[in-house]
């Protein structure tokens, strides 16, 4: 996920290559022994664009390993980093403009990514980070701030999910203790095992990163800036941070305060009804799902571990690359088994419930109840709010519904009639276009950028 830039980790070709797929003049890449360098237009230049100087910077770090590589260069100011103007797509083996990958408003300066690593990305792309700005990020030009960002390890290391390991390492430095633990198969109790926590606590381990959240108070942020983020696996996540729930708790006074301070706090990441629409924030979707929110028994409560595993099982015969590309979904949770482990009564009458042939796309629980309505990493991603198809929601939010995401040639009127016939869902009033024109065409022509991408 995060690596030092070395010949073993950099996948793009830096051997005297010119990249034109960037804003302004082309970027030139060079290799100096084991070092990687880039020459490009100075993103911090504030004078006339025709006078923008060129700068040469060393690439020191990489984020991304499955879909793309983002290259970070040392700015020369303290420990602050910035991103090259291009991003390398791994499957396509090509460069694209950074603005095509890291979406931002068209009027936002390209220089605003300076320091993003130190203030934002470091929180989830490293283990035990400390942002260490002398004044709050964005409170003044980063060139005027002292930046001394540190992290214990790059990437998601053991302690990110299992908690501090010092006591565990000290205790198990004794070979006799290690041997006894091995033959008895007992945990030493000195590390957190997320899969053994209750569904809420185990999901919060993932939610520390996979959520839209904010500190409750500025003082909390100041402490985290200097001492590190206070949450540890096994803690109650909401004790130290506010996790946004515009769907499940739209009247939250804390949420209203953040929206007043930043109108994009919600609309930048959620559909208008509060459902998450961007990738990497699946915890917000999970906690608004009835399978999590309304469950009363732990064994029947949906959690991240209901479907995903962070360590590939020895019983999983798939190559590790295949497992990783399925978002680390367990081999026995890729199909309807994920839902039928709880909804057992559906098994003998599945086609009666779905009105589709067993084994077809329309008979897959995921496709109807977790459709591809989130966007990120240049692709559509399944919603992690378990819901049912609704034409009314498509009308009010603009969010594609599961039926029309499969039946691309059908109208919202057609879908409304089918849902009414099968499930008694009252169809909403539609205008002429919604009755006569395929919903997919309406979304492509009238939807916002996120909808068109889906």
Enumerate the language-model features and the residues they cover:
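Primarily the internal scaffold of c-type cytochrome electron-transfer domains
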Residues: 1-64, 70, 83, 90-106, ...
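Conserved oxyanion/phosphate-binding beta-strand-loop segments in alpha/beta enzyme cores
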Residues: 79-81, 85
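Flexible coil/turn and secondary-structure edge motifs
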Residues: 89, 111-114
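A gly/proline- and charged-residue-enriched helix-loop-helix capping module
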Residues: 100-103, 114-120, 127
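Residues within well-ordered beta-strands of beta-sheet-rich folds
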Residues: 120-125, 157-160
């Amino acid at each position: 996920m995060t690596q030092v830039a070395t010949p073993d980790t950099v996948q793009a070709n830096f051997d005297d290559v010119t990249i034109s797929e960037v804003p302004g003049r082309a970027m030139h890449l060079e290799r100096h022994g084991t070092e990687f360098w880039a020459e490009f237009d100075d993103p911090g230049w504030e004078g006339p664009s025709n006078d923008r100087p060129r700068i040469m910077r060393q690439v020191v770090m990489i984020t991304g390993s499955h879909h793309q590589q983002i290259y970070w260069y040392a700015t020369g100011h303290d420990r602050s980093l910035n991103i090259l103007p291009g991003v390398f797509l791994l499957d396509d083996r090509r460069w694209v403009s950074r603005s095509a990958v890291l979406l931002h408003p068209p009027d936002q300066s390209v220089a605003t990514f300076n320091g993003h690593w130190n203030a934002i990305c470091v929180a989830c792309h490293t283990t035990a980070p400390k942002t260490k700005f002398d004044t709050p990020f964005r409170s003044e030009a980063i060139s005027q701030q002292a930046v001394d960002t540190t992290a214990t390890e790059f990437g998601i290391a053991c302690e990110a999910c299992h908690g501090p390991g010092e006591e565990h390492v000290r205790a198990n430095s004794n070979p006799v203790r290690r041997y006894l633990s091995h033959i008895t198969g007992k945990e030493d109790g000195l590390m957190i095992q997320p899969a053994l926590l209750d569904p809420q606590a185990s999901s919060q381990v993932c939610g520390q990163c996979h959520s839209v959240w904010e500190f409750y108070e500025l003082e909390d942020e100041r402490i985290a800036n200097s001492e590190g983020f206070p949450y540890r696996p096994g803690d109650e996540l909401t004790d130290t941070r506010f996790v946004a729930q515009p769907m499940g708790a739209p009247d939250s006074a804390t949420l209203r305060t953040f929206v007043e301070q930043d109108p994009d706090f919600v609309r930048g990441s959620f559909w208008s009804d509060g459902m998450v629409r961007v990738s990497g924030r699946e915890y917000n979707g999970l906690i608004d799902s009835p399978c999590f929110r309304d469950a009363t028994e732990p064994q029947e409560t949906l959690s991240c571990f209901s479907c995903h595993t962070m360590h590939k099982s020895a019983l999983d015969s798939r190559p590790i690359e295949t497992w990783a590309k399925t978002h680390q979904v367990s081999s026995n949770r890729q199909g309807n088994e994920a839902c039928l482990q709880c909804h057992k009564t559906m098994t003998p009458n599945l086609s009666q419930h779905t009105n589709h042939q067993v084994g077809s796309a329309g008979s897959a629980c995921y496709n109807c109840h977790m459709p591809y309505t989130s966007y990120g990493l240049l692709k559509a991603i399944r919603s992690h709010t378990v819901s049912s198809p609704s034409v009314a929601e498509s009308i009010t939010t603009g969010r594609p519904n599961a039926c029309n995401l499969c039946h691309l040639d059908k109208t919202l009127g057609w879908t409304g009639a089918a849902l009414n016939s099968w499930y008694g869902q009252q169809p909403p009033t539609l205008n002429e276009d919604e009755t006569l024109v395929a919903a997919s065409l309406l979304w492509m022509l009238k939807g916002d950028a996120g909808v068109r991408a889906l």
